[in-house]
Amino acid sequence: MDIRGNVHRFVKFYIDGWKHFRDPTMESSYSAVYYWREQMKAMFLYTTSKERQMPYRSSWHTLVIIQATVCFLTMCYGVTESLGDKVQMGRDIAFIIGFFYIAFKIYYFQWYGDELDEVVEALETFHPWAQKGPGAVDYRTAKRWYFTLAFFLASSWLVFLCIFILLLITSPLWVHQQILPLHAAFPFQWHEKSIHPISHAFIYLFQTWNVMYFLTWLVCIEGLSVSIYVEITFAIEVLCLELRHLHQRCHGYEQLRLETNRLVQFHQKIVHILDHTNKVFHGTLIMQMGVNFFLVSLSVLEAMEARKDPKVVAQFAVLMLLALGHLSMWSYFGDLLSQKSLTISEAAYEAYDPIKGSKDVYRDLCLIIRRGQEPLIMRASPFPSFNFINYSAILNQCYGILTFLLKTLD
């Protein structure tokens, strides 16, 4: 596909999202998951076996891995220049942790790209989840809300991404003693502008490209990951709607029995997709929990260490807010998934009518009620699930460690 086609493929989510927002009667043909996948394909970094069979894709994926590896290793080597300066070393470590998170995701989905695509295909196959035909439930309000939420999240991320990239690639112009967007060191001092101006210019462009490409891809994979769980939450809402309108849609015992049997399978399909999703994202969920924990701890520790320097405190305060915001977002959607899943048993109980139905119908509803009492969770076993209760526990743990470290430093 040509460059113009890929650009259109990338911005299509924002174009369709804006049209959808402006026109309440408009219904999107796809979920947000589809659009995020299209953006990753437009960047040539949707790492599935099918994509790798396309011209130049496999070579590009290999080149991306080499770029990420070189960038990460040179950033690690750059720490040797910061030894003795606690603030600079803390800043270097923070960027290394952040870039390691990006590189880990790139490596991880080289292995799990096909399984990720299986989840996406399953969600797109069943979207919008509701049974079609006479008596179909009106799911459009819920669908519009979730799609609009995804659109505004994507738009806000895009704005902040552009601002962050602009600040990062121009930082050598306004940050004292910084000569590259990312502090890094190369052999033979190739990064020193005064000694090797040509190689310095090349490294500057290399880092600028990496910053733009990898951060944009990170937003896409994060958006895809979040949207998958949001789509599962939407499926739960559709299931609840169909349960609550069961007797309005079904007339006669046979039709009722067939429908309750379908709803049992519908519920089981949601559980199966969620289990598969948790399995696919197992490594990344653990990694982002650990990365956020370290970034929050590091930023607070460095801010306390340099508390007499307002500029340094402001830098690490922003870093802390970014880490907390990222963790809060995942905790919110994890909570939303769990809370909505608990309404399944309530909806099934409302569908129970002793006057109508048969023994088979009651058995199906009881099965849904029993299964629905266990909340569906976003989790990477054996670690705790993503919700605000565990989020608070992580913050308390950070506070305890920092208190101990500060007392030790004093």
Swiss-Prot record:
Main localization (coarse): membrane
Record's subcellular location: Cell membrane
Residue numbers on the Extracellular membrane side: 81-92, 170-222, 301-312, 407-410
A GO-annotated cellular component: plasma membrane
Domain of life: Eukaryota
GO molecular function, one term: odorant binding
Ranges annotated as spanning the membrane: 60-80, 93-113, 149-169, 223-243, 280-300, 313-333, 386-406
Positions in the Cytoplasmic compartment: 1-59, 114-148, 244-279, 334-385
A biological-process GO annotation: signal transduction
Subunit structure: Interacts with Orco. Complexes exist early in the endomembrane system in olfactory sensory neurons (OSNs), coupling these complexes to the conserved ciliary trafficking pathway.
Known function: Odorant receptor which mediates acceptance or avoidance behavior, depending on its substrates. The odorant receptor repertoire encodes a large collection of odor stimuli that vary widely in identity, intensity, and duration. May form a complex with Orco to form odorant-sensing units, providing sensitive and prolonged odorant signaling and calcium permeability.
Family indicated by similarity: Belongs to the insect chemoreceptor superfamily. Heteromeric odorant receptor channel (TC 1.A.69) family. Or49a subfamily.
Protein name: Putative odorant receptor 65c
Species, as recorded: Drosophila melanogaster (Fruit fly)
Gene name per UniProt: Or65c
